[in-house]
From Swiss-Prot:
It is a multi-pass membrane protein. Coiled coil: none annotated. It is found in: Membrane. The keyword Transmembrane applies. The gene is TMEM187. The keyword Ribonucleoprotein does not apply. The chain crosses the membrane at residues 8-28, 51-71, 94-112, 119-139, 146-168, 193-213, 233-253. It comes from the Eukaryota. One of its GO terms (cellular component) is transport vesicle. This is Transmembrane protein 187. Keywords: Membrane, Transmembrane, Transmembrane helix. It holds the Pfam family TMEM187.
Length: 256
């Protein structure tokens, strides 16, 4: 493993551990989250252990791990010398590390159905959407480590909105999605090509599917197509796809 890859994974692990420790202090114990099988259209199978009680909604989270491993093993490409390639590898591997962490965290939420795991799942979603913003800023303004720290720090702090209002997380997530799409459109206009534009369009469509399918989980269950593989399951598929297309979009800009 390259030193910058190890550094990227260490930074992701450190930030994740700090989030876990913060959640377990109880500071977010009054945050409104959905806990319980009744919030999912997939019927739990009582004969299975808790971590597989909703088998499809549980196992789909392995896709994040596979995605993270795939991109962690992929080669980073960037114009310029070794320094530029090291920076491109760090950017890519932080994002891959986030995918590696996010899959197990979501599985914990599905399997345990506790308030702390639900909070952790919500909280870690925000810096994942913030990383493409930081990546785009790096492509546009050059390598500025303090900028990464500022973007991710602001993203993590934005979860405090969940303490102020029952829908504070949804507001924070909406702002993150808008910022990520806005930065991607801006960087596409300045540095993109047809290929990167295609990846961006597919990523935005996947993001739309991720949001709509999750919100309509119970409504879609009225249709036979969504009774076994529910809206929540397909929203996770769309989430993995938007992750993948974000990788393709951002890494393609390094070679434009």
């Amino acid at each position: 493993m390259k030193p910058e890859s190890g550094q990227a994974l260490f930074h992701v692990a450190l930030a994740s551990c700090l989030c876990v420790a913060t959640v377990h202090t109880g500071i977010f114990e009054h945050v409104s989250v959905q806990v319980g099988y009744e919030y999912y259209a997939e019927a739990p199978v009582t004969s299975l252990p808790a971590f597989l009680a909703m088998p499809f909604n549980s196992l789909v989270n392995m896709a994040y791990v596979f995605l993270g491993v795939y991109w962690l093993r992929s080669q980073a490409r960037a114009p310029g010398g070794p320094a530029e390639r090291r920076r491109a590898r760090y950017l890519k591997d932080v994002f891959a590390g986030m995918a590696l962490v996010y899959g197990p965290v979501q599985w914990l939420r599905i399997g345990m159905q506790t308030q702390p795991t639900a909070v952790l799942d919500q909280w870690l979603t925000l810096p994942i959407f913030a990383w493409p913003v930081a990546w785009c800023l790096c492509l546009d303004r050059g390598w500025k480590p303090w900028l990464f720290l500022a973007v991710e720090g602001l993203s993590l702090c934005s979860y405090s909105l969940a303490l102020l209002h029952p829908h504070g997380f949804e507001l924070a997530l909406g702002l993150h999605i808008a910022a990520a799409v806005g930065q991607a459109l801006r960087i596409q206009g300045r540095h993109g090509n047809i290929s990167s534009g295609t990846y961006l369009a597919l990523g935005v469509l996947s993001c739309l599917g991720f949001v709509v399918l999750k919100l309509c989980d119970h409504e879609l269950a009225q249709w036979h197509l969504f009774q076994q593989l529910t809206g929540h399951f397909w929203s996770k598929v769309c989430d993995v796809l938007q992750f993948h297309f974000a990788f393709l979009f951002l890494t393609s800009l390094h070679t434009c």
